[in-house]
Amino acid sequence: KQNEKGKKMNIRFYNAKILTLNEQERFDIINGELWVKGDTICYVGESKNPAEICTELQMEQPAWKREIDVKGNLLMPGFKNAHAHTYMTFLRSYADDLPLQEWLYQMCFPKEDKLDTENIRPLEVLGIMEYLTSGITTSFDMCYFPPVYAQVAAQCGFRAVQVSGVNSFGGSAAVVEENYLKVNETSDLTSFMIGFHAEYTTKMELMQEIADLAHKYKSPVFLHNSETQNEVKECLERYGKTPTQLTEELGMYEYGGGGYHCVYFDDKDFEIFQKRQLTAVTCPASNLKLASGIAPLKRFVEEGIPVAIGTDGPASNNSLDMFKEMFLASALAKVREMDAECISADKILYMATTGGAHAMGLDNCDRLAA
């Protein structure tokens, strides 16, 4: 938090129920208080004499700018939206009732071609405002003009991690590198990873250049992966491999990463994600609207593959609501497996908070802890 002069604030939250993670990475709720000093949580624990807390922490008592009585309500980590196209607020409900390829190529791409560095800004501000209404405090974005979104997010005080969405219709590895350097220097709230849109929009030469960039900067790589049956089928026809197997062979994942959607995996795909500890980001509402399918969350969890949850863009979702995504992720997994106990509620909550933070490389923002 910052005050009206742009200075970081010291805030004490007390009389709160606080959602924390225990040593088994399971959620616990404690009664107590939470202190924020500047931009860092410095205490989470029982309520007691502040002087006693400061003695234990070997610190001077902060001069509080605000002391907030939470009145027994819950303090919890912000949701981490692990896949988004925030700027697509202007395409909400523009193209309903279409499968992915028609929706993308005939409806979305032509409209997106009209975007520029100025008209995209209010679209992104609108998306950030909507994120905050459902407690989303960070987005993992694939968007046009990444330096612009970094500026917008920083001005809003919103944390934004971006990944390159380059494809063979436009852009180049050189532009990806330029964006990587610019965004990572914009603000402490913004960062950028190497990636590309998808195998089906990207030629082999560009994919190899992206892999080379990932090695140069030791960056994780993310892309849309195995979202539809047709995507996997066509990749097999082109290369004799699934998108996961192809990108693994190209050396994309030496420094981690993952995929968005991950609906249609074969055994070898699961093996690669498990071995590399890649994150599968599920986007249930988007996959329903475009009739793409239901991701195999139970198997991801059983095989120890990290999972996070994303809304995807508002054009393929129609809202940016993590509560809706959590419900759908849970309910669809139960129906897919015909097993009401296949994934617990706290596991889904973990995916929407800690799982997303880990996917974005935000290990210091994954829980409420000092």
Language-model features and meaning:
Residues 6-58:
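N-terminal metal-binding scaffold of metallo-dependent hydrolase/deaminase domains
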Residues 19-31, 290-291, 297, 357-370:
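Acidic, glycine-enriched loop/beta-strand segments at the rims
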Residues 90-122, 156-164, 229-254, 276-279, ...:
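Active-site gating loops and adjacent loop-to-helix segments of metal-dependent hydrolytic enzymes
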Residues 92-157, 178-186:
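Alpha-helical scaffold segments that flank or form the walls of functional sites
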Residues 148-263:
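Metal-coordinating catalytic core of metallo-dependent amide/deamination hydrolases
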Residues 173, 229-241, 269-273, 291-300, ...:
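Histidine/acidic-residue-rich catalytic or RNA/ligand-binding cores of hydrolases
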Residues 249-256, 298-370:
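His/Asp/Glu-enriched, well-ordered alpha-helical/loop segment
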